[in-house]
């Protein structure tokens, strides 16, 4: 236990040294989009033998076991136990909204609608988050940021290219369920910020996964799904569960909860716009699926939208690099004021 704890702390120190502090959120955001986007291939494989809610339950069984084991090995008892009312409510909110409702509605809805329309409906999450933030937190987006979110959403529509038939076909109920999943994650993210739990985000994520896994198992039973055991499925299904459960759940959700705390729900949930891009790239790399001109153009539109939302951060970084070129100051230094960029 001591060796494991020492190794974990050592790894954390190395990670902090290798990535400058101002870039950690950006690196976490990109990594999160890759982990979420690359999970679709494994999920599609697993759903061939497992019903959707049971698959989601197993996913969070694995994720919770991995994260709770890591937390118990690397944190003192005082750090991983909820201590305040806000901690308990934070775990409950994350478990119900971000884990249970999000995944139950998303997995069920995907079974009755096309992947293209599911991507568009789920892409409304960053549009809904500012509405909940205004209602619950009093936060307001600038007109430029709102325009950037709209442009990024348009880029997602270009990438998935939904047809008019998908809007009026039999998948309308499925589209509504996926939209409900987007609303659940948007509302849960904002509620979590309002509650301001004091415990570290990693143990909070672990306990939320445990709560979500139990609730998903209950929904699977209540929905009459066949309770297939993991031992009775094929090797590919087991492998898909491990791939989804560890990197795309344990690691990805830990990153997501960290970003919710650091950059807020509106900016963190913009990852929903990058996921279709990483999913397309994963399909191209692993399955040989082609990248159409529409996908490349849509990616450019999404990048332009992000540029508007993060214009101040990008401008400050450009100024920092300019100063480095002129005066030789390291662009990765975190000390000192934000350098002016008047020219």
What is the meaning of each model-derived region?
Residues 2-3, 132, 141-164, 173, ...:
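Hydrophobic transmembrane alpha-helices of multi-pass small-molecule transport proteins
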Residues 51-65, 108-127, 170-184, 234-249, ...:
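Structural signature of hydrophobic alpha-helical transmembrane segments
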């Amino acid at each position: 236990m001591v060796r494991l704890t020492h190794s974990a702390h050592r790894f954390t120190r190395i990670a902090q040294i290798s990535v400058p502090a101002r870039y950690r959120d950006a690196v976490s955001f990109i990594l999160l989009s890759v982990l979420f986007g690359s999970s679709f291939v494994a999920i599609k494989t697993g759903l061939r033998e497992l019903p959707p809610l049971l698959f989601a339950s197993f996913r969070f069984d694995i994720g919770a076991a991995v994260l709770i084991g890591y937390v118990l090995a690397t944190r003192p008892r005082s750090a991983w136990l909820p201590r305040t009312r806000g901690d308990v409510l934070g775990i409950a909110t994350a478990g119900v909204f971000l884990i249970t409702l999000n995944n139950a509605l998303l997995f069920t809805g995907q079974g009755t609608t096309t992947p293209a329309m599911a991507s568009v409906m789920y892409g409304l999450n960053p549009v809904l988050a500012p509405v909940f933030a205004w209602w619950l937190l009093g936060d307001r987006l600038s007109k430029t940021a709102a325009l950037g979110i709209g442009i990024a959403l348009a880029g997602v529509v270009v990438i998935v290219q939904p047809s008019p038939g998908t809007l009026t076909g039999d998948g309308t109920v499925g589209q509504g369920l996926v939209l409900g999943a987007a609303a659940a994650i948007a509302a849960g993210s904002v509620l979590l910020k309002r509650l301001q739990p004091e415990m570290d985000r990693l143990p909070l994520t672990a306990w939320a996964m445990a709560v979500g896994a139990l609730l998903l198992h209950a929904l699977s039973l209540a929905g009459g799904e066949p309770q297939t055991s993991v031992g009775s499925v094929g090797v590919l299904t087991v492998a898909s569960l491990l791939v989804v459960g560890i990197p795309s759940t344990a690691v990805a959700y830990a990153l997501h909860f960290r970003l919710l705390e650091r950059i807020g729900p509106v900016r963190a949930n913009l990852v929903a716009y990058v996921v279709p891009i990483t999913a397309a790239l994963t399909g191209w790399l692993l399955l040989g699926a082609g990248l159409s001109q529409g996908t490349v153009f849509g990616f450019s539109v999404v990048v332009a939208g992000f540029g508007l939302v993060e214009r101040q951060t990008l401008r400050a970084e450009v100024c920092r690099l300019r100063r480095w070129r002129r005066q030789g100051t390291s662009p990765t230094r975190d000390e000192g004021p934000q350098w002016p960029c008047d020219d």
